[in-house]
């Protein structure tokens, strides 16, 4: 079932001639999620990812590919793109029909969902790691590696039955192996070449501090926000001098709409011990010049500014009063 999409992808992703390799491991993978509500109603979703960046998707209403980046077509021609879209339309129709016919054989009950992921990862030096996995209702079902279908323990007899069935079709297995070990890396390199400028950019992070909800009386939650950085790897830690604070809690690195990233790191401390703490940020775009923000400095600055503004307002009122009073004396 899940292998049918890979057989089609072998046609969709022709080999490229890109020879330059990125120094860091990076992967391209396709995900599929198919929801079967009853014997006549199913819905398919698919997307293609370059690492953590979604570069294309599938519009199930129009039956067309959504290229989310100007460079995500790689070196494909318009004719090849049209062919891809037609093959995907045929695939999804066939996939739904085949699954619905095998519902009883594989002991499936409506509603259910099938997920699949397949792709390849390139390492420096040209090493290739390919992968293909399938799941039902979020549970690992099977995987394919080196001409072997490996049923997952949680897949039970259904997974064993599927592997026994698919391995009878050596032609499909040959296509899948070729796709994962040869075609996928070449397509990946084509996209990397087309998107080199965007993928190799370095954007400096912005950082600021705030106070979160108090975890308990007498405590403060210190929050360090880091946003707008690219690439994704970043190091954020609360410090006291040069001593890392192991109680620092890092959230997930979340995407911004502009393909940069956001992260927050929190630290719960006794209120009277907050003085002297700082947040340190390390990122490749900073050239070794870490961002260091000290807790309390911003608050002191605002207090000083508020006092200065207040004094200025009082002085202004005094000058106006004096001017009016002096003018009144002149009239008399």
UniProtKB/Swiss-Prot annotation:
Keywords: Adaptive immunity, Cell membrane, Disulfide bond, Endosome, Glycoprotein, Immunity, Immunoglobulin domain, Lysosome, Membrane, Signal, Transmembrane, Transmembrane helix. Its main location: membrane. Residues 323-332 are cytoplasmic. Disulfide bonds join 120-184, 149-163, 224-279. InterPro entries: Ig-like_dom (IPR007110), Ig-like_dom_sf (IPR036179), Ig-like_fold (IPR013783), Ig_C1-set (IPR003597), MHC_class-I_related (IPR050208), MHC_I-like_Ag-recog (IPR011161), MHC_I-like_Ag-recog_sf (IPR037055), MHC_I/II-like_Ag-recog (IPR011162). It comes from the Eukaryota. Residues 1-17 form the signal peptide. GO terms for biological process: adaptive immune response; antigen processing and presentation, endogenous lipid antigen via MHC class Ib; antigen processing and presentation, exogenous lipid antigen via MHC class Ib; positive regulation of T cell mediated cytotoxicity. Coiled coil: none annotated. The keyword Glycoprotein applies. Residues 18-301 are extracellular. Gene3D superfamilies: Immunoglobulins, MHC class I-like antigen recognition-like. A motif (Internalization signal) lies at residues 328-331. Residues 185-295 form the Ig-like domain. During protein synthesis and maturation, CD1 family members bind endogenous lipids that are replaced by lipid or glycolipid antigens when the proteins are internalized and pass through endosomes or lysosomes, before trafficking back to the cell surface. Interaction with saposin C is required for the loading of bacterial lipid antigens onto CD1B in the lysosome. This is T-cell surface glycoprotein CD1b2. The gene is CD1B2.
